[in-house]
A protein has these predicted regions:
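Structured catalytic/nucleic-acid-binding cores of DNA maintenance enzymes
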Residues: 1-170
Length: 170
C-alpha cells in the first residue's frame, strides 16, 4: 500500500499538471461514471493529500481517492493510450506547456466525489500527518504515551499518525 510520502508526491505532481485547468474526466470501466460526469469539464483547484488519502478539489466537490493495496496512477503527456482493463478513472487536460497531459487510476479502494462535510468526517478520524505543514504532533504523542499497545502497532494505526505504513514501521 502506498504510504503518505507517495501520496504527497502524487498530489504535488497532479496539481502541477492539472490545477487551474478544465479537466476531462472519464470512467472507461464505468464504476465511476456518475462521479466522472459530475466533474467532467470543471476546473481543478488543487490536489492535496492527508495520510494515505488524496483529495482533488473541484469547487465545492472533492474527489477522494484511497489507493489501498492495489491502486495505482500512471501519467503521461501527449495522447493517452487506449483504455484497457479495469481503468477506473482517466483525467485529460492541456498541460502547462500546451501539451496534453493525462493520468489513469486503476484498482483504488476508494474513488468517490464528496462534499466538504464528508471530507471532514474522513479527516476527523485520522491522526496528524507529519508531512503536512503545521502538523501538530502533540495529538500523536498523547495517543502513543497513553497506550499500552506496542509502538509498531500504534504507528500503523492511522488515527494515531496518518500516512505511516510498513515501510516506516520496519
Amino acid at each position: 500500500m502506498p504510504e503518505g510520502h507517495t501520496l504527497h508526491r502524487l498530489a504535488r505532481d497532479q496539481s502541477l499538471a492539472f490545477a487551474g485547468r478544465p479537466v476531462h474526466v472519464t470512467s472507461p470501466q464505468g464504476r465511476f461514471a456518475a462521479g466522472a460526469a459530475l466533474l467532467d469539464g470543471r476546473v481543478l483547484d488543487e490536489v492535496t493529500s492527508y495520510g494515505k488519502h488524496l483529495f482533488a478539489c473541484f469547487g465545492p466537490d472533492t474527489l477522494h481517492v484511497h489507493l489501498g493495496l492495489y491502486g495505482s496512477y500512471t501519467a503521461g503527456t501527449g495522447t493517452p493510450p487506449p483504455p484497457r482493463g479495469a481503468l477506473r478513472m482517466r483525467w485529460e487536460a492541456e498541460g502547462p506547456d500546451g501539451l496534453g497531459v493525462w493520468t489513469d487510476l486503476r484498482g483504488a479502494t476508494a474513488c468517490e466525489v464528496l462534499t466538504a462535510p464528508e471530507v471532514d468526517r474522513i479527516l476527523d478520524r485520522l491522526g496528524p500527518d507529519p508531512l503536512r505543514p503545521r502538523s501538530d504532533g502533540t495529538v500523536a504523542h498523547r495517543r502513543i504515551a497513553g497506550s499500552r499497545t506496542a509502538i509498531g502497532a500504534l504507528l500503523m494505526d492511522q488515527s494515531v499518525l496518518a500516512g505511516v505504513g510498513n515501510v516506516y514501521r520496519a
